[in-house]
Amino acid sequence: MFNLIRKSTEWGGKTLVLESGKIARQANGAVVVTYGGTTVLSTVVAGKAKEPVDFLPLTVQFVAKSYAVGKIPGGFLKREGKPSDRETLISRLIDRSIRPLFPSGFYDEVSIVCNLLSYDTVTPPEVTALIGATAALAISGVPFNGMVVGARVGYLLSEDKYLLNASADEMLSSSLDLFLSGNKDSVLMVESEASELSESQMLGAISFGHQNCQEVIKLIEEFREESGILPFGFIPHDITSLVDDIASSYTESFSIAYSNIVKKERVLELEKLRDQVLSDMLAKYEQPNGNLQCQYSSQDIISALKSFERSLVRSKIIETSSRIDGRAFNGIRDIEIEIDVLPKTHGSALFTRGNTQALVVTALGTPQDEQIVDDLDGDRRENFLLHYNFPPYAVGESAALRAPGRREIGHGKLAWKAIRYVLPEKSDFPYTIRVVSEITESDGSSSMATVCGASLALMDTGVPIKAPVAGIAMGLIKEGEKFIILSDILGDEDHLGDMDFKVAGTSSGITALQMDMKISGISIEVIEKSLLQAKDGRMHILDKMNLVIQESRECIKNHAPRIESIFINKDKIRNVIGSGGKNIREICEKTGARVEIMQDGTVMIYAINNDAVEYAKNMIMDIVSEPEIGKVFDGTVIEIVKFGAFVSFLGGKRGLIHISEIKNEHINAVGSVISVNDKVKVLVIGIDREYVQLSMRRVDQETGEPIDGELYNIRKTNSDSDDSFLSSGSVNNRHGSEKKRRGSGRSRRSSGGSSYHRDDLHNNGFGNGNRSFNDNRNGNEVPRKPRFF
């Protein structure tokens, strides 16, 4: 029933298996790839384009379902919705890797779906999916020039060792995360983030990855041979004569238009010329009988015009060594930089390079603002967000605003990779950071303008980044064996060239790299020269940025939120929260701050100003602090009793001011001096296992300073000892007769027992006229553990 084809090999320490003929047999090509414990079903379906087009309508979708890791989706519907950012990014990786290998002029619809069936959270799914897409194309019959394989490369800096398809845990210690795709002869696509690695280290990673792809390329070739399926015949429509006809009539006009360095004017001139060419060529090639059939269709004319323009610009650059805007090959456009351009934002920068402009804005938030990512590798929280927006007006188009597309997600992720390494550790800067790049003008390299603008905006905000980051986009014009590398490419140079090579980094090294090809790959030699030329351009841009701001501001702006983190004993968390959240609510209501308590005892305090942060911090520290003898605290009288007053202090702790410690002179009734809810300053003069002894008379109630600056060295006693303050001995004594308790108390007083040394009292000036804490001058007995404690 099944015509099963199976091939396998060992690659990167794991088994790689290709299978077809059993699943999804209605597709033009379907391959199940299992690499380690990760399985992907890749399918290819091709058909005629629904409408005449002059481009390849290729659609690539990577789909990751929760069942692949044995999970049920969250939410009400319990079903996957729109593609996640990770699915979108992997789809782009596959698309960018295979698109250059379709033959020129092939405009049939091609749909590739890579469905993640099983995931071991170890083997990179993007590697498995690209292998599956290539193998499915190989047996689909769709014209496809060669095999392309992807590899994920890591780098252990301490060991100078490259890693192939390492697990997520292994990549934690890696200084590099690079995904590369290549065919037998060249590299097609690179996407990476790094921790300030040198050009030679990055080049070594690319070379290492490309070499390791060869084994799998050979396996796919053997797999295709065993299937016996060959690509169906494709003969592109010959439009050579049409290209020559356009060139003979319009070369001068287009040369003049492309010489205009003002993009807006250049675009308008080119649009008029294109409309004229289309009109003239349709009229010229219309059949004599007057029907609408032409020897060449409008799509043929558009394709021929694109081919003509591409050849015109490329030949001008190569023959005259002059670019569209007159710059040298390594020239950088004029740069203008402004920071702090928006008054009420937490940080902002306007970065303009030629006709490309990015307005980048930062916002600071609390850990509650972190992005919760529901990923197959496990839920995680992101405290750094970077969003890239590309509105239609940036290129002079009239169109409705839409949700971020694949391109915007991809460009934002590249800038995120470029910036992430230089951000401070969360323990040093606990804010959630959001950076938004609004592209207000675009003429090439808007993602790298975002990188520069983000670095400037972060420094303007006061985020202590390790170093400024700049980015540059490189281009390539390749004719035969001759090639020219262009620095800081324009949009037209990107469109008509062969490569878009983006490099971002600090003065010390590369933090992100992305390479896309429009031809079937480039050699390691071209990549090396591109990296070195990009370094010169990056340094030039960093110099321009340093003229405006060299390092982060010392502090965040006044209108930015304040966050402070403190650590408390985990056992004290319940005290801070309080019964039913009473304490934490009181803190938030009184201070206006927001307080977050982590399980490890980290307390995050968020407020709009420093005063509120300090107020909340002091309230929390009062709750978790322990009273110390000799320390003065603010307290509130909560109860008046015959023998003294009970005071609440340190966030709810209770202490007793004996009547003898209220004033230096004799008082008949406590209520004649203080009342409930009175605010008092008290000195801790004794600590028991359960009780705290307080004094008012020894503290200046105005200044809060101990009288005469004296600190009392009072002995901390055990609550069960005979001379312990408010000690009743055993539990049985507590429940004895009142007569017995009073007798016991008088016995202690007559024996001179005290909760502190009498010698200490004498030494501290209490020997003459000053009475001990147990003194009975007011005729009151010292209570033995009151029941309401």
From Swiss-Prot:
Required co-factors: Mg(2+)
Composition skew (Basic residues), residue ranges = 737-749
Per UniProt, the ranges with Low complexity bias are: 763-780
Q: Where does Mg(2+) bind?
A: 494, 500
The residues covered by the S1 motif domain are 630-697
One GO biological process this protein is involved in is: RNA processing
The entry's family comment says: Belongs to the polyribonucleotide nucleotidyltransferase family.
What the entry lists under HAMAP family is as follows: PNPase
Q: Write out the function statement from the record.
A: Involved in mRNA degradation. Catalyzes the phosphorolysis of single-stranded polyribonucleotides processively in the 3'- to 5'-direction.
Its recorded name reads Polyribonucleotide nucleotidyltransferase
What's the name of its gene? pnp
